[in-house]
A protein has these predicted regions:
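...captures the hydrophobic TM-helix bundle architecture rather than a specific catalytic motif
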Residues: 1-199
Length: 199
């Protein structure tokens, strides 16, 4: 395996570059998935039936906390990748751990939000609006949950094998995935929550 030391570690082999390119293609498919879910939501968001609408169930404070946690995690994962590129394994792992803890905090708030909805009688079966909303939020939440366990697995590999072209490639691809989830959340925050609160 030929290593090009003039490139960042995650790009240093032809195989690594192909894996990163392949992951961008995968993210394209993920964009299609979330675009479909957003389209369904925008089509059904006025069909509340006898259930509540967004303005009646959305609470701004928890949503702001969720946004703060995810956007901060995007910053810390970026710091982790920077630390990886300069060969600082401890700092890289520390920033990745902080990222995952922030993601865990986000999930905790989201689970509490879903529990609150259910206690208020707003379930996936109540209306088309709630069905579309919970499918969109749930899909994003499942992606964050998967990302958490994926990040833990990468940290375990870096801890046992150190930073090498393979582990750096995996960590970088994970960071792309995490940034993607943050971008999706910005759209959810802007076009689902804020739009729902002011409509």
């Amino acid at each position: 395996m030929k290593i090009d030391s003039s490139l960042p570690l995650e790009y240093s082999t032809e195989e690594n570059r192909l894996k990163i390119f392949g992951f961008w293609i995968f993210l394209g498919a993920e964009i299609v998935l979330f675009a479909t879910l957003f389209t369904v939501y925008f089509t059904l968001h006025t069909r509340t039936g006898s259930g509540p609408n967004g303005a009646e169930i959305f609470e701004l404070t928890p949503v702001l906390w969720e946004t703060f946690l995810l956007l901060t995690s995007s910053f810390t994962i970026g710091l982790g990748v920077h630390a990886m590129r300069i060969g600082n394994k401890k700092a890289m792992m520390a920033f990745f751990i902080i990222t995952l803890l922030l993601g865990l905090g986000f999930l905790g708030i989201e689970i509490d939000e879903f529990v609150t909805y259910v206690h208020e009688g707003a379930t996936i079966q109540t209306s088309a609006f709630l069905s579309a909303l919970m499918t969109l939020l749930g899909t994003h939440g499942l992606h964050v949950t998967f990302g958490f366990f994926w990040g833990v697995a990468i940290l375990m590999q870096v801890a046992s094998r150190g930073l090498n072209p393979q582990t750096a490639n995996k960590a970088f691809i994970f960071s792309l995935y995490w940034h993607f989830l943050d971008v999706v959340w910005i759209f959810i925050f802007s076009f689902v929550y804020l739009k729902g609160l002011i409509s």
